[in-house]
Every structure is written in structure tokens, then in C-alpha cells.
Amino acid sequence: MAIDPVILSQELISFPSITPTDNGAIDFLSNTLSQYGFTCNVLTFGNDEVQVCNLYAQLGNGHPNLCFAGHTDVVPTGDLEKWKFDPFSGHIEDNILYGRGAVDMKSAICAFIAAVSRIDFNQVNGAISLMISGDEEGNHFKYGTPAILKWLTDNNKKIDYCLVGEPTSKSSVGDTIKIGRRGSINFKIVCNGVQGHVAYPHLAQNPINDMINILHKINNTVLDEGNEYFQPSNCEITSVDVGNTANNVIPGTVTAHLNIRYNNIHTSESLFNIINNICAETTQKYQIFTSLSGDPFINYPDKYSDMLSAAIKKTTGETAVISTSGGTSDARFIKDFCPVIELGLKNDTAHKINENTSVDDINKLANIYEEFIKQFFNISQ
């Protein structure tokens, strides 16, 4: 019996799985998939501080193994008073489904499950699997998808191609496919001076002057012009702080934070060299700290991305745009294990108050996924 993706979405949204808390969402999916013949492995990883509940479910044992990747955790709701409806009620009003996770990305998970439920698995020469993380949105993501991938390797399980259900669409479902993502690196720059009284500047050294010059140079540096698949890299100054509340004190230290979203023209090392050289040209009294969120990657268009584009065209009439724009996703981990592509709902209300998606869009996404599965396994229509 085929699953209704909208009803399943309502049920999954009802679990308040604010990252990294699960609150039963993974068990619900495991129980649902078990009824359709999936072998389900509920996988919990973590430390003394947090335990993240994940799921790997597989139907069949052959190859190729087509895997759908997603996450059940959601961002916090924000001010509940500003929501039209309870964010975990899965309420539908005027054909619109409201709820935290409706877009990012519980409904996409349900659309894929519904698509699989419509398939005659006797015609599948291979396997279909789902890899569902319990922490993609939060700070404990290493216990989500990366830990599942390690478990797969340790247990000699292999996925051959992965479809990630992140909300990639812009104006209409299926208008944008992600074949890669930009990298993201954070910089913390500290300039040191000598604290003192503003009336005696000759006895102090104001580090703000050096920082202003550094940030001005960074802001006027063109990192690159982009290429065929990536937009130009860009740097954003996200904060400047001296921790000084007194008007008559020259601060001794100033700190700035930057984030660079970068394409495959650069590496984290090349960007560090650019920032470091700018600092060194200005002052010797500085420190740089970095944290890498993910390197850029691309899976160049292939027969499977062509299949997904064809599935979109057949079911919606839409000609999909191939893109690498947007933020990071768990695809940055999966790309080291197999080719990966991303397609999901429209992203215009993701993480917002009154996050919502239309019922029609959920059904449309399920239809696209179903057609893609059929083309992937060459299933007769």
C-alpha cells in the first residue's frame, strides 16, 4: 500500500526533534520503514554530553545501492507567539502545511519514503537505502552523518549514489539541483596593542587602527571571478569587538571574525595565505585562528544527474538549473564515499517563523523522486 507523503510529513513534524534531541522521530521512521521490508539500524553516537540518534535503513542487498540522505533534527522554533499554529502540530491551512521541519527537511524524507512505497521492488536490481542523521543543524553533527558513514565502512556496507533532500528549489519545486557546494572557512583575527588612557596616546598603542587597515584591505581583495560551476568566492566580516565599555580607554586588543565562502579555485590553505599576508603587511602584532566547516566540492554532471533532470522535466515540465550555490550541507561528508546530488523543496521559509510548504509541492517532490528511482533502476513504467 502506497504511503501518503503529506500525512507522513504531518506525523513526522509532530515529533519536536530540536537538534540534537530526537524525541522519537528516528524510531517513528524505523517503524514505518520496517513495515515496508527495510532492515533498519538505529545508530546512537555521542559522548558524555550528548547522544545523537540516527538511522540507516536498507531494502535489498544488491548493487547499485541508491541512498537517500536527510536529517530529522530541526532548528529551534523561535518565538512561539509569532507562529500561526503550533510548530509541531503539522497543521494544514489552505493547502499549506505549517511546522518546524516542513521545509528543512522532514517533508522531503517523507516524499522519498512515499516514492519508494509506490515502486514494485521486484523490478529493482540493487538496493534502496535511507541515511537519516539526528544532528545536521547543530554543533554535534560529527555524531550524525560522518558517524553513520564510518559505521557503514566498518560494517562493509557500500552506497553507490546518494540523493540528499535538502531544500534546493527556489521559485518552484525542481527548478534547482545542487551538484556541489562552496567551502566555508571561519577566521578569527586578533590585533594586539598597548592599553592606555586616551589623553596619553603616546603611552599606548591602539590596535583598532591596524585592524581597520587589515579589514579594509580584505574587503577590497577580489578572491576570484568564479568559474563555470561556481560563483565568485566572497568574504564577509561578521564581527569586530574590543570588549571596551569605557570611553576614555584605548583598548589593548581587538578581535575580528570573518567567514569566506569559496569555490574550487581555492583551498583553505590558499585563503589562509591571503589573509595572513594582508595582516603581515600591516602589523607584526597579530594572531590568526581558523576553523574549517567544509571544503568545496563538485560532482560534475553525469548520467544520474541527467536522470534527475529528466525526472523533473517529465513530472513538472521544469528545466532544472544545475547549481553549487547556498550554504554547506551533509553532502560535504558524503562526497568522499560516493557521488552525491541534492534536490528538495523550496527553501524560502526554511528556519523561519511559520516555516511551511504547500501540499502540492510535497506531492510534486514525491513524484519526482519516484520517477528518478524508476530511471535509476531502469524500471518499466
Swiss-Prot record:
Single annotated GO MF: succinyl-diaminopimelate desuccinylase activity
GO biological processes: diaminopimelate biosynthetic process; L-arginine biosynthetic process; lysine biosynthetic process via diaminopimelate
Disulfide bonds: none
Protein's UniProt keywords contain Amino-acid biosynthesis: yes
Source organism: Ehrlichia chaffeensis (strain ATCC CRL-10679 / Arkansas)
Name by which UniProt lists this protein: Succinyl-diaminopimelate desuccinylase
Family: Belongs to the peptidase M20A family. DapE subfamily.
Swiss-Prot/TrEMBL cofactor(s): Zn(2+); Co(2+)
NCBIfam families: dapE_proteo (TIGR01246), PRK13009.1 (NF009557)
Substrates-to-products reaction catalysed: N-succinyl-(2S,6S)-2,6-diaminopimelate + H2O = (2S,6S)-2,6-diaminopimelate + succinate
